[in-house]
């Protein structure tokens, strides 16, 4: 089995930066050693948002964005190597999720598309890359997402305690870790995505720091109820979603019935939407003893307070309390998935994604032996 140092690279739906994590991994442990977040330039962020919202673009523009993101991911990896004074030969492989620009796992031709050319990452780092993790699961009839519940189970599963792990990124997803039961998990709906989109349009701020703006507003109950009637929330698992569905256009359609709504009230309502839609799914699955939160939403004090209030009797805390950085969880998961791919081990859980079978995931982009030796 391949073991040693791996690097995980994650650029999620929040677009708040490229998370890069260094970890030592083998069959018995995942030990995080270092991490950093690398900024995404404004022009790349705009290009990603345009695609995700269905804006037309040429194949040339898509190809350029693919290349530019691959180079950006390589820069982020090289920055971590320099920070830690490591050489390419010190790293077994990079697990790179890529940037999701479209996710449509149902219909006549299910598909998902992550860009950020892995060939450029190999060329500019000299390290083997494992990427394209989601499409094998979709080819096997699955949703292609979420993939992190398997990692949550490996790190945070407990033999007797009924736990759930909640990742609040752009989209929120829930992992159900119940003793004696198959792991389940799915996307509950919007996490930070709509809150970030609204404050960006209104205030040109990337996110609502400490929920300060939302705290100034009041929840618009009819708007909240209208949004919660979206059929996605009532759909049965397995299910997954993304920015191609819960985007600014989705929000605008719901706001059309509320002309003149105060911008701060809308922000407060979006925070409540995230908390309520998550809490409903926690309770629908019978609750748990401990809800462990990771992702950027774990730093939103309003969302965290509302979850605690809506889920009385459940301990709501971040994964940091368990010794695992909530900010680095997803990048760490893809480092682990790269290890599993190189070890010939399956990376998906059919009980989560709905795939017909467990499978080794991803494609391997080998480094030239002369550079990784």
From Swiss-Prot:
Pathway of action = Amino-sugar metabolism; 1,6-anhydro-N-acetylmuramate degradation; Cell wall biogenesis; peptidoglycan recycling
Q: Which InterPro entries match?
A: Anhydro_N_Ac-Mur_kinase, ATPase_NBD
Q: From the Swiss-Prot or TrEMBL record, what is one GO molecular function term? A: ATP binding
EC numbers listed for it are 2.7.1.170
Taxonomic superkingdom = Bacteria
Q: What does this protein do?
A: Catalyzes the specific phosphorylation of 1,6-anhydro-N-acetylmuramic acid (anhMurNAc) with the simultaneous cleavage of the 1,6-anhydro ring, generating MurNAc-6-P. Is required for the utilization of anhMurNAc either imported from the medium or derived from its own cell wall murein, and thus plays a role in cell wall recycling.
Write the protein's name. Answer: Anhydro-N-acetylmuramic acid kinase
Which source organism?
A: Salmonella paratyphi A (strain AKU_12601)
Show the taxonomic lineage: Bacteria, Pseudomonadati, Pseudomonadota, Gammaproteobacteria, Enterobacterales
Q: Which gene encodes it?
A: anmK
């Amino acid at each position: 089995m391949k073991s040693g140092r791996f690097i995980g690279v994650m650029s999620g739906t929040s677009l708040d930066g490229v998370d890069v994590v260094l970890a030592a991994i083998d069959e018995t442990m995942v030990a995080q050693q270092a991490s950093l977040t690398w900024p995404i330039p404004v022009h790349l962020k705009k290009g990603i948002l345009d695609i995700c919202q269905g804006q037309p673009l040429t194949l040339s523009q898509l190809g350029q964005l693919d290349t530019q993101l691959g180079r950006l991911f390589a820069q982020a990896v090289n920055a971590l190597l320099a920070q830690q004074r490591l050489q390419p030969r010190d790293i077994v492989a990079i697990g790179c999720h890529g940037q999701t620009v479209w996710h449509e796992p149902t219909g006549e031709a299910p598909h998902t598309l992550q860009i950020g050319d892995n060939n450029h990452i190999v060329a500019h780092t000299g390290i083997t890359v494992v990427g394209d993790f989601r499409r094998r699961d979709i080819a096997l009839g699955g949703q292609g997402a979420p993939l992190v519940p398997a990692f949550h189970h490996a790190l945070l599963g407990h033999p007797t305690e009924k736990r759930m792990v909640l990742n609040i990124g752009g989209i929120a997803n829930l992992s159900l870790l119940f003793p004696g039961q198959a792991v389940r998990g799915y996307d509950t709906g919007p996490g930070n995505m709509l809150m970030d989109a609204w404050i960006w349009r209104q205030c040109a701020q990337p996110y609502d720091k400490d929920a300060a703006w939302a705290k100034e507003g009041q929840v618009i109950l009819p708007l909240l109820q209208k949004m919660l009637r979206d059929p996605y929330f009532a759909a049965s698992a397995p299910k997954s979603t993304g920015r191609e569905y819960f985007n600014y256009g989705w929000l605008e359609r719901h706001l059309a019935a509320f002309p003149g709504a105060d911008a701060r009230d809308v922000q407060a309502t979006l925070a409540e939407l995230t908390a309520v839609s998550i809490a409903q799914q926690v309770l629908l699955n019978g609750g748990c003893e401990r809800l462990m939160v990771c992702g950027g939403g774990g730093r939103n004090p309003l969302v965290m307070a509302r979850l605690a209030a809506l889920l009385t009797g459940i301990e709501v805390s971040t994964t940091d309390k368990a010794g695992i950085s909530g900010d680095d969880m997803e990048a760490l998961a893809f480092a682990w998935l790269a290890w599993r791919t190189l070890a010939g081990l399956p990376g998906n859980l059919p009980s989560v994604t709905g795939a017909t079978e467990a499978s080794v995931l991803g494609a391997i982009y080998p480094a030239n032996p002369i550079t990784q030796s």
